[in-house]
Regions:
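Short glycine-/aliphatic-rich beta-strand segments at the starts of folded cytosolic domains
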Residues: 1-10
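Short, conserved charged micro-motifs
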Residues: 12-19, 46-51
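Short secondary-structure junctions
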Residues: 25-31
Length: 76
């Protein structure tokens, strides 16, 4: 599963709970829903492809993890 960040179009913010429920039924595991239109969740690749096609979804990006070594570590 991949962690994703979904942004919902502003015109659908009054239906945010309904949109989140629809995405959950599609297979999204919801971690958090922010009232300003951002949904954080986890989904398999095939679910991500389906979610991208929802008219309410303005953007969908994968949350990337970056690991930075401590300042005193050796350069690789």
């Amino acid at each position: 599963m991949r962690q994703i960040i979904i942004t919902i179009y502003e015109i659908y913010l009054d239906r945010l709970t309904i949109v989140a429920e629809q995405l959950h039924r599609e297979g999204l595991v919801i971690i958090h829903v922010y009232e300003f239109g951002v949904i954080i969740g986890m989904a398999e690749e095939k679910v991500i492809l389906r979610i991208r096609n929802h008219k309410e979804v303005a953007s969908l990006v994968e949350d990337k993890q970056v690991h930075i070594p401590p300042p005193d570590s050796e350069v690789q």
